[in-house]
Every structure is written in structure tokens, then in C-alpha cells.
């Protein structure tokens, strides 16, 4: 039976994906959010989903209301009105936990790589059989007839605890979100609690020391590059400017050669996890092989464009591990070009906690440009760290730039520009694109 859903904070990446999925399943969907443009809203607009400003008049007791996790009575009029008037609502993760019970569910968790891996698994499985999915880049697809449900499983504030999927991948465990987690051990404990809720199969990266300590009542399958100790092993790697080719073995059995048109060693591991899960779940590997070849990636993960013959890459990387992976992918695809990193640190707490690691990661580029730190709505800038503190630790050519003046980026010939961050780094990218376009106009 069709329902009416109202999303408080519909432009959030998970919220927009869920809204799209429910819309495609035949439900009436609307939502509210701030007026500022966010990259997820284009998909909502194309689907004809109404986006309203926050207003208590948006709420109706007959609706099923889903609220974004960032909103509280003290910062959102709709939440405040709902609480004052006894109107019930569910948080995103609470709704998702109950929603997935009607499907064979497959989750993807991990400190890094979960969006790309969720996208890859969704792409392959939806081409094999009817599948609904939610990806953290704001993409969602729903089918009333789907048996399978693929979703991204987020560890922040332990939001994944309402989830009990049949299968799950955990890509890695790393210290992140220092505004919530107190230590690597705290992060591990969250993932270990999640792992205990998997019912049929858990697939973890076997070369991650923390993941080796994971326990679960479900069978655990390890994947990696090393033959010893891993169940699914990727070997015979061929990394070229058109993608990556590799062979996968399962406990000594050759499962064949696979190709992905994406870049970086991390994507080979993501694909190995997907292959392992689908093989274990009983899917035809020939179909898996065929559809991996057409996976082009997800939004804001190594997204490329060319402006005035200049290659620009946009990536959500906001943790040192992710920066290293993104720069590795750029070098694979563009081995003869200078790799220029343009990075905006995201949150003061993360920048303080990982300052030396950020410097080490950014030193993998040939030149580094830094934008001012993007503070989260959850924190206050106490002046404990500035972007110049990071700049002082970088030993490659580096400079702090402003969105009003990105012209220093023009000092490079034969370069690829990699814009990275989870804040508003795209405003710097767009400023650079306008500068490049104006150069073309002036020449003409």
C-alpha cells in the first residue's frame, strides 16, 4: 500500500538516496531542507520530489516522517513542532533497520571505501537480479518486486546498530570521527558489535590488523592480496590507464580473471570483496565478471571532467588513508602528469587528531594547495588549529589559497588537479573551472 513520506533534511546523502528509493517503489515522497544547493538535490528534482523550506506546516500526522540525524528540537522547527505535538518520527537509521527486514540485505561498512564498494555491489547485483539499493553518494533505487537490498552501513554514532543484514562487507577499521569516537579501540568495538549482527556471511579485509580481531556468529571470509590467511585472494595485477585487471582465487580455486575500469589498489580490494560476497551467495561469476566491467564509479569518488584541456578530479577524500588511495588512483591513470592536490580539511577535531597523517598523505602529491578548514555544524572553532599548521608540515611545493583567488593553480603544466574534501571544496573547483573557461574566452 502506498504511503506518504516526509523527510526532514532530505538533501543529506543517505536521506536523498532513501527518498529516491521510496519514490521509485511507488510511494509519495516530499522533504524539507535548507535553501543552499547540495549535489544530491539534482536527482531529487529530476524525480519530481518536492523540496520545501523547513516549516512546521510541512508536517501532517498521517505522514510517515523520517528525520535526519543532525536535526534536534533546538536547531530545527519541524523536530520541535513534532515533539511538542506528539507527532512521531523515526531517525534515518531506525527506519532503515526496520525497512530491510523484508529483503535479503547486504551491507557495506568500513572507515573508508564503503560508498564506492556499495556502488559497485549495487551496480553488479542490480544488473543480475531485481535489487533495491542505497548508496552514500545520494543515489537510491527502489523496486517493489526486489528480493535483495544493498545499503551503506555507517559507523558514525553507531548508526549501524539497528541493522541485521544477512551479508556484509567491512572494508577496513581506522580512527576517524574524533568528535564521537575516543580511540581506535572505541571504533573497533563499534564494528565488532555490528559484526555480531550479521547472520549469513561477513567479508573483511584480511590485511587490516583490527579486522583480524573481529568476531561474528556468521562465517567470516577474509579477502586481500596475500595468499596466506585470506580466503579470497587477488593476484596477477595489471594496472593500466584503462583500469585494473586481476585474478581471484578462493581457497586455492581459480575463480578467473576480472577487470574493473576504475583505478587504485583500493578498488581492486573493493571488487574482490564484491566478488567474494556474490560468489558465496550463489550468483553466477560470469555475470559478476561481465557487469564489473561496466562499473564507472559513484558520485564524488574520483569524478573526472576536462575543462580547457585540463583534467580535474573531484573526490570526497577527507581522511589521510582516503587521500593516499585517491592520489594512487590518479597516478595510475595519469602516470606522465604532475599530480596537484587541492585539499580542504574537514572538521577541526579531525584536523587536530590526524595532522601529521594528513601531511604524510598530501606529500604523496607533487604539489599541494590548501583551503581553509571546513568546520562541522557539530563543533565550534576554538582556534586550536589552523590550516597553516598543516601547511607547515608539508615538504612539497604548497600554498594556502582562497576561493576568490585560485590563480596560483595555473602555475603547473601538464598537470592533473585533484580536489579533495567533504566540505565545500567544490566551490574552489568551480572557481578554478571558471578561471580556465575565462582563459579560453580571452584567447578567442
Swiss-Prot record:
Q: Which reaction is catalysed here?
A: UDP-N-acetyl-alpha-D-muramate + L-alanine + ATP = UDP-N-acetyl-alpha-D-muramoyl-L-alanine + ADP + phosphate + H(+)
What Gene3D superfamilies does the database record attribute to this sequence?
Answer: Mur ligase, C-terminal domain, Mur-like, catalytic domain, NAD(P)-binding Rossmann-like Domain
Compartments where located: Cytoplasm
Which terms in the GO cellular component ontology are assigned?
A: cytoplasm
InterPro entries for this protein: Mur-like_cat_sf, Mur_ligase_C, Mur_ligase_C_dom_sf, Mur_ligase_cen, Mur_ligase_N, MurCDEF_pg_biosynth, UDP-N-AcMur_Ala_ligase_MurC
For this UniProt record, give its keywords in alphabetical order, as a comma-separated list. Answer: ATP-binding, Cell cycle, Cell division, Cell shape, Cell wall biogenesis/degradation, Cytoplasm, Ligase, Nucleotide-binding, Peptidoglycan synthesis
Entry's EC annotation: 6.3.2.8
Superkingdom of origin:
Bacteria
Q: Which GO terms describe its biological process?
A: cell division; cell wall organization; peptidoglycan biosynthetic process; regulation of cell shape
- Alphabetized GO MF terms: ATP binding; UDP-N-acetylmuramate-L-alanine ligase activity
Database matches in NCBIfam families: murC
Q: What does this protein do?
A: Cell wall formation.
User: Which PANTHER family did the record assign?
Assistant: UDP-N-ACETYLMURAMATE--L-ALANINE LIGASE (PTHR43445:SF3), UDP-N-ACETYLMURAMATE--L-ALANINE LIGASE-RELATED (PTHR43445)
* HAMAP family reported for this sequence: MurC
Protein name, per record: UDP-N-acetylmuramate--L-alanine ligase
- Name the species this protein comes from: Streptococcus pneumoniae (strain P1031)
What are the leading ranks of the lineage?
Answer: Bacteria, Bacillati, Bacillota, Bacilli, Lactobacillales
**Per UniProt, what is the name of the gene that codes for the protein in this document?**
murC
Amino acid at each position: 500500500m502506498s504511503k506518504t513520506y516526509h523527510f526532514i533534511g532530505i538533501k543529506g546523502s543517505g536521506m536523498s538516496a532513501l527518498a529516491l528509493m521510496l519514490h521509485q517503489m511507488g510511494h509519495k515522497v516530499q522533504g524539507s531542507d535548507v535553501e543552499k544547493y547540495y549535489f544530491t538535490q539534482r536527482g531529487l528534482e529530476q524525480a519530481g520530489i518536492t523540496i520545501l523550506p523547513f516549516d512546521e506546516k510541512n508536517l501532517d500526522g498521517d505522514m510517515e516522517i523520517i528525520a535526519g540525524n543532525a536535526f534536534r528540537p533546538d536547531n530545527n522547527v519541524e523536530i520541535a513542532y513534532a515533539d511538542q505535538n506528539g507527532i512521531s518520527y523515526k531517525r534515518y537509521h531506525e527506519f532503515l533497520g526496520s525497512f530491510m527486514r523484508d529483503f535479503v540485505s547486504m551491507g557495506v561498512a568500513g572507515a573508508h571505501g564503503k560508498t564506492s564498494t556499495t556502488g559497485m555491489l549495487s551496480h553488479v547485483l542490480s544488473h543480475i537480479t531485481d535489487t533495491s539499493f542505497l548508496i552514500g553518494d545520494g543515489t537510491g533505487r527502489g523496486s517493489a518486486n526486489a528480493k535483495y537490498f544493498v545499503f551503506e552501513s555507517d559507523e558514525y554514532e553507531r548508526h549501524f546498530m539497528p541493522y541485521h543484514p544477512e551479508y556484509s562487507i567491512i572494508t577496513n577499521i581506522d580512527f576517524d570521527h574524533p568528535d564521537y569516537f575516543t580511540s581506535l579501540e572505541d571504533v573497533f568495538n563499534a564494528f565488532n558489535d555490528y559484526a555480531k549482527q550479521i547472520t549469513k556471511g561477513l567479508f573483511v579485509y584480511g590485511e587490516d590488523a583490527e579486522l583480524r580481531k573481529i568476531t561474528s556468529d556468521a562465517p567470516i571470509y577474509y579477502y586481500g592480496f596475500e595468499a596466506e590467511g585470506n580466503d579470497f585472494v587477488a593476484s596477477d595485477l595489471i594496472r593500466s590507464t584503462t583500469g585494473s585487471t586481476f585474478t581471484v582465487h578462493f581457497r586455492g580455486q581459480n575463480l578467473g580473471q576480472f577487470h574493473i575500469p576504475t583505478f587504485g589498489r583500493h578498488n581492486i580490494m573493493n571488487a574482490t570483496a564484491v566478488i567474494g560476497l556474490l560468489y558465496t551467495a550463489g550468483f553466477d561469476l560470469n555475470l559478476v565478471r561481465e557487469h564489473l566491467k561496466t562499473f564507472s564509479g559513484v558520485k564524488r569518488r574520483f569524478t573526472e571532467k576536462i575543462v580547457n584541456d585540463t583534467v580535474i578530479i573531484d573526490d570526497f577524500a577527507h581522511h589521510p588513508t582516503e587521500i593516499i588511495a585517491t592520489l594512487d588512483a590518479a597516478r595510475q591513470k595519469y602516470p606522465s602528469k604532475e599530480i596537484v592536490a587541492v585539499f580542504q580539511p574537514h572538521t577541526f577535531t579531525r584536523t587536530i587528531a590526524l595532522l601529521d597523517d594528513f601531511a604524510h598523505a598530501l606529500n604523496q602529491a607533487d604539489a599541494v594547495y590548501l583551503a581553509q578548514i571546513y568546520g562541522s555544524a557539530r563543533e565550534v572553532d576554538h582556534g586550536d588549529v589552523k590550516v597553516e599548521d598543516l601547511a607547515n608540515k608539508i615538504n612539497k611545493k604548497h600554498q594556502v589559497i582562497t576561493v576568490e583567488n585560485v590563480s596560483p593553480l595555473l602555475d603547473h603544466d601538464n598537470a592533473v588537479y585533484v580536489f579533495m574534501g567533504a566540505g565545500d571544496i567544490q566551490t574552489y573547483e568551480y572557481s578554478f573551472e571558471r578561471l580556465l573557461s575565462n582563459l579560453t574566452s580571452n584567447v578567442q
